[in-house]
């Protein structure tokens, strides 16, 4: 009954929701540090805009996200026709695979990295070529060695999820320049807004030069709109036109569009989230060093720390204390956990609990 490839695909397993943990374990308080969400949530301006939009829930949304597209295009200094929106950037990865990958084609990605790249490749009957990380980041030299006549897409998560590492400007530019123009290069910048490092490359600046480049970004992370599912891609007008051919109608709901428009105007909230994240990472690094736990310096809003024992067991023990993190076994890092930066009090509770379970 089912396509053979479906047997090879594992469903995505999200971080445990707070309500489920409370119900299963009978806990009154649960701190979720598992899914790289903004602990500040959306800004007050966004909440106000959402409340004012509720009378329109009976109407279909703007299928082209016109107002949002115009506003974002101005902010990014690109044409509106270079942008497409999706129900999270997850959906756009599926659209990308559907316009480029035929059965038997391949796409290249790092391992571990964002798991959807592998999934969407398999769904199209493609072959995922997974290149192990080198020093916890993308090994682009090895990527180049695996490009062949059946390669259709190259996925680069920058910063990488789950390790939080980056490919620096010159290395990424030279790699993209070396890739044949008929192969799509996707640079996923979900955590870009957290970064101030001058060596971090914003690939949007290269779109005029590389017509095969696609840049993914999202409102789920620093903007605090994860539950509304809205992300976007910026690329050449030709690529965006092809993506729109396979995009479902009305794929981004009205409330998500309204929230994103309001979020773009609230730079003060973004700066506040960046500052909190910076302080949280510094606190984690200091705490891990005191505990003599190795960790990977992160450019995102999360950090991978080596707990030096079975991460699943540590995850379970933390769960009993009302702390949700991500065990690293799903990333082929069986002694690591990934922890999202939280509010100051949440971070302190996590470190206290971690000391108790180790």
UniProtKB/Swiss-Prot annotation:
CDD domains: AAT_like. InterPro entries: Aminotransferase_I/II_large, HisP_aminotrans, HistidinolP_aminotransfase, PyrdxlP-dep_Trfase, PyrdxlP-dep_Trfase_major, PyrdxlP-dep_Trfase_small. Pathway: Amino-acid biosynthesis; L-histidine biosynthesis; L-histidine from 5-phospho-alpha-D-ribose 1-diphosphate: step 7/9. The keyword Transferase applies. It is an enzyme of class 2 (transferase). SUPFAM superfamilies: PLP-dependent transferases (SSF53383). The keyword Hydrolase does not apply. The modification N6-(pyridoxal phosphate)lysine is found at residue 221. Its EC number is 2.6.1.9. Keywords: Amino-acid biosynthesis, Aminotransferase, Histidine biosynthesis, Pyridoxal phosphate, Transferase. Homodimer. PANTHER family: HISTIDINOL-PHOSPHATE AMINOTRANSFERASE, HISTIDINOL-PHOSPHATE AMINOTRANSFERASE 2. This is Histidinol-phosphate aminotransferase. It comes from Caldicellulosiruptor saccharolyticus (strain ATCC 43494 / DSM 8903 / Tp8T 6331).
